[in-house]
């Protein structure tokens, strides 16, 4: 048991020596001594201890004072067993409230010492094991996050055909998320734009996100014509996602195919938020779409697209509901009203400026509240 490091804190030299002897009898030889709470805190700052046996009544800084200091930074605080007299029960209760694991009477009865110290050390071992597994899991999730973010395009200057500018951002609510965006240069001189949202969050949604992105990219190459119909693209993706969909995972999507030279194209919306049109007028939602189910919900569904024309100077704002449904600490939604008010003054700005303004407005609104959904924004402007 020499690997177990213990700290004994007591202002009585007799008690310190007695406890050190009892610990040595049970195989604990790595024992550090401290005369009071000040020395104890200095020792804890200097090295790692598996357990602290802490006296209650001491000069300079007593046991309760030490526990209060340790509670201020519990990350590196070792487990504590309070050394007390049975007449100090009220103080013992206070110590437990401050985080002490157990208490030990000053008689230092060997069987009781063995049992209580052994129980505390075992709990610490299990906590350390859980912390290590959590650390490894977080490292794996961070790696997955990096891999997921690498799937979506970032170099929009090489993607956008002449006459178009594009910007986008995606912020998962967890390490990995279910939102996606796509900006894809088409061989016929056009561009494919898409924002989609997978039901659910976390790793399962992240896997479906990657699958959906792959299906859309593959379908864009399979559908014939210089400007493939977005309805046909989503129909191909739906065939892949709806087959054997036992988990009932759905994907909402808004997909646009646009001719960069003429500004003409088509749009297909599958259960998703409709884009906003950005120009000199107040931002307004594109309308006239047929209500269509999300991808994965209805196998064999025949999706339909609508004509779309983007005049020089006009832009389109595509987003996921993580923007409009962002919540503050009072669980109020950001809402479309705030979104439209935010878009109005930047409606003629560059796509990058619109994206930046959106993320800043949402961050200001939530004011540090935990993010509950993935946030994705994509903006395109012609001319």
How would you label these PLM feature ranges?
Residues 104-106:
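A Lys-centered signature of the CheY-like receiver
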Residues 131-315, 367-383:
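… and, occasionally, acidic/histidine-rich disordered N-termini of signaling adaptors
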């Amino acid at each position: 048991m020499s690997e177990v490091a213990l700290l004994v804190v007591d202002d009585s030299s007799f008690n310190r020596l007695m406890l050190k002897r009892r610990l040595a009898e049970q195989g604990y030889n790595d024992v550090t001594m401290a005369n009071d709470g000040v020395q104890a805190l200095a020792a804890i700052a200097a090295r790692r201890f598996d357990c602290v046996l802490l006296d209650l009544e001491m000069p300079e800084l007593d046991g309760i004072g030490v526990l209060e200091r340790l509670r201020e930074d519990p990350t590196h605080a070792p487990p504590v067993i309070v050394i007390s007299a049975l007449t100090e029960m009220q103080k013992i209760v206070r110590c437990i409230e401050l985080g002490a694991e157990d208490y030990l009477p000053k008689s230092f009865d060997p069987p009781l010492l063995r049992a209580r110290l052994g129980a505390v050390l075992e709990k610490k071992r299990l906590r350390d094991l859980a912390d290590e597994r959590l650390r490894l899991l977080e490292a794996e999730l961070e790696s997955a996050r990096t891999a997921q973010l690498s799937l979506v395009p970032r170099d929009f200057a090489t993607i956008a055909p002449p006459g178009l500018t594009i910007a986008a951002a995606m912020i998962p609510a967890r390490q990995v998320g279910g939102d996606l965006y796509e900006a894809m240069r088409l061989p016929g001189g056009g561009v494919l734009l898409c924002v989609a949202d997978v039901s659910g969050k976390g790793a399962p949604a992240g896997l479906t996100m990657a699958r959906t992105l792959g299906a859309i990219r593959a379908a864009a190459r399979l559908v014939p014509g210089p400007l493939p119909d977005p309805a046909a693209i989503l129909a191909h993706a739906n065939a892949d996602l709806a087959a054997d969909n036992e988990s009932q995972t759905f994907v909402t999507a808004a997909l646009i195919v646009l001719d960069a030279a003429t500004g003409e194209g088509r749009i297909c919306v599958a259960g998703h938020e409709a884009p906003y049109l950005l120009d000199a007028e107040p931002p307004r939602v594109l309308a006239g779409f047929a209500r269509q189910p999300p991808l994965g919900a209805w196998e064999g569904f025949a999706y339909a697209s609508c004509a779309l024309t983007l005049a020089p100077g006009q832009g389109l704002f595509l987003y996921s509901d993580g923007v409009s449904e962002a919540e503050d600490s009072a669980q109020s939604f950001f809402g479309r009203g705030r979104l439209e008010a935010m878009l109005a003054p930047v409606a003629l700005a560059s796509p990058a400026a619109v994206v930046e303004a959106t993320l800043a407005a949402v961050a200001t609104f939530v004011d540090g509240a935990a993010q509950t959904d993935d946030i994705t924004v994509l903006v395109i402007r012609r001319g």
